[in-house]
Amino acid sequence: MTLAYIPSPTISQFSIGPVTIHFYALCILLGIVLAVWMTTVHWKRYGGNFDQILDITLVAVPSGIIGARIYHIITTPERFFGPTGDWVEMFRIWNGGLGIWGGVLLGALAAWAWCRHKHYPMALLGDAVAPGLLVAQAVGRLGNWFNQELYGAPTTLPWGLKLNMEGSAIGHSEQCYDGATCPTGTLFHPTFLYEMIWNLIGAALIVFLGSKIMKKLKAGSLFAIYIMWYTVGRTWIEALRIDFAHEFLGVRINVWVSMAVFVLGVVAFIVIQQMGKSTELLAEKLRTVTEIELSLVEDGETGLPTAKANLTKTKDEITANDGSSVSYADDQSDNK
């Protein structure tokens, strides 16, 4: 008889009148709120403000969710298009199914496009968002707990996960390897908990590095560290999971993807350290852009002379190190 285990929730949703609210969605929303808050704190230290992060969030988050869903659909097409598939399930995100790499890719592309449009240093944004992104992913994993999904192999460890076979939870089957049903009461590795702990440790590590040795790192280094940290954790945690997944050479596709992205993270870190721009220089650029925006908001077109005057003090440095012209005060006047 098992004396210690992690219980599963008895519900995965609740209703307020005609509206059904899923805990999976609430976990994602809470993660987004925490990520925005943490990103804003770090972004302000670089010279930006909350309004800039809010604008980026409104562009990047919807794009990231769409990208994450597309990645899941591509990697598990039989759920939606197979003989037993249902294409309507593509739109039922609350039932689970978001692929982190699709979210990071499309969300990052959207953020990059907005930063380029507004002349914000994308490398600084990556560093600012890195710890918050890990915290958001950690909180989001709680949604898997409520859905009783993505658990690992059977275990006898005292922190094993015991599935709830009653109530309104989505996961009702104690599946072992190859879809076979395990004996009732089987405990499973709580992979959601492993990833939560791993991500929170990574977030703390990145915050520590950012506060202690940031002057030794080029802008963008913290985001590269995020990529390396997350992919290492995802590789070993993914290997514990027993839910259905496509494989290549006997290894889950997501493991291959994580290893490939880890290599890209290492390469990115090396390139950034060799060819990247200093955090202080890009922070000065961000402060200047922020001053321009504030001048335009407060003074309108009459604020352009002041904005251009503020820009003069960093024009030579930014032009030399950013490889682009710094005559964007006029552009900002069009975007106010």
UniProtKB/Swiss-Prot annotation:
It is found in: Cell membrane. PANTHER family: PHOSPHATIDYLGLYCEROL--PROLIPOPROTEIN DIACYLGLYCERYL TRANSFERASE (PTHR30589:SF0), PROLIPOPROTEIN DIACYLGLYCERYL TRANSFERASE (PTHR30589). InterPro entries: Lgt. Pfam families: LGT. Keywords: Cell membrane, Membrane, Transferase, Transmembrane, Transmembrane helix. This is Phosphatidylglycerol--prolipoprotein diacylglyceryl transferase. GO terms for biological process: lipoprotein biosynthetic process. It is an enzyme of class 2 (transferase). It is a multi-pass membrane protein. The keyword Lipid metabolism does not apply. One of its GO terms (molecular function) is phosphatidylglycerol-prolipoprotein diacylglyceryl transferase activity. The chain crosses the membrane at residues 16-36, 53-73, 93-113, 190-210, 220-240, 253-273. A 1,2-diacyl-sn-glycero-3-phospho-(1'-sn-glycerol) binds at R141. Pathway: Protein modification; lipoprotein biosynthesis (diacylglyceryl transfer).
